[in-house]
Amino acid sequence: MPAEGGKTDMERIGLFSEMEYITVGDKYVSQFNRPFNEAASKNKQMLPGGSKEMSDLQAGYFDPHFVRIFEGEGYINLNQVRRRDMVEAAKKNLGKAFLPSNGEKKPCGLGSYYGTIGGPVPFFSAQSKPREKYKAPGKNLYTNPGKKGTGYGYANITIGKQFSHSADFYDAAKLKYKKANEEHHRLLKGAPFKLNLHPRDYFDANPYFSEESLPPIKKEEKKKTISNTFKPSSPGKKPGGMKAGTFDPYPSHSADPYVAKLANISGKDDKIFHPPSGPKSRPVESIMTLNVRRALNSKNYKTSSVPSY
């Protein structure tokens, strides 16, 4: 029995009841020794062939052999058939065509004079009047020849006068610069001032600079000392056990509890409420699903069909 408030083994597995036994005393048959068509081996209804796929072969048709559509018939003209249908439709007419008792009603709206008092006005008649033959007017007088293009590449076609030609030297800019440079050197009074000494700053960058050479650096000779091996002042302390080698003394034993115990613990004798378990279900596989799984699989889903009873 499980502890109070626990679950049973069946509930822990996930089932709420023990599964029923499928067979009683039947021997196990491996899947290799089983028949290919289990339903046919048990004298059950055999499944017919599946749905036919559309193809050019004879299996794609419903008849066992190909049947001609117009076998034993002559050539038929579509116009002849159409006229024959028209004659048969005309025979169904009982009398002449229906004629209304009154004449056709004229429209009374925009552009119509039906229903007006005066009728149409002859001045606004829609009849075309005879006209004289059209004579094209002559060309305008030309005071100047026609302009050519937009002006680029053509002379004397703009509003203003054409600019007069003025010759310019090839090196005009170079000659102007040379002339200005000569005028600048003419205004100078003499050669630029040049100091005959090496340029130096007002003050030396190094304030501790001295022209005298410094004496050589004296190196102190160090005496070689022979170091002895290190020996500890006291032996090493062992961990655990004896605490005589520690810095602090071992605390004395005290029987007093760290926390005062309570005389009565609340809730220890109270019973835990467990609600009664209701009806529980277990997973059940449908018989229809099992039948579909056996009859329809990945190999025969194209050729299988619904059996008729």
UniProtKB/Swiss-Prot annotation:
Residues 220-249 are annotated as: Disordered. The keyword Kinase does not apply. The keyword Cytoplasm applies. Keywords: Cytoplasm, Cytoskeleton. Detected in testis and fetal liver. It is found in: Cytoplasm, Cytoskeleton, Microtubule organizing center, Centrosome. Its main location: cytoplasm. Coiled coil: none annotated. One of its GO terms (cellular component) is cytoplasmic microtubule. Belongs to the CFAP96 family. This is Cilia-and flagella-associated protein 96. It comes from Homo sapiens (Human). The lineage of its organism: Eukaryota, Metazoa, Chordata, Craniata, Vertebrata. The gene is CFAP96.
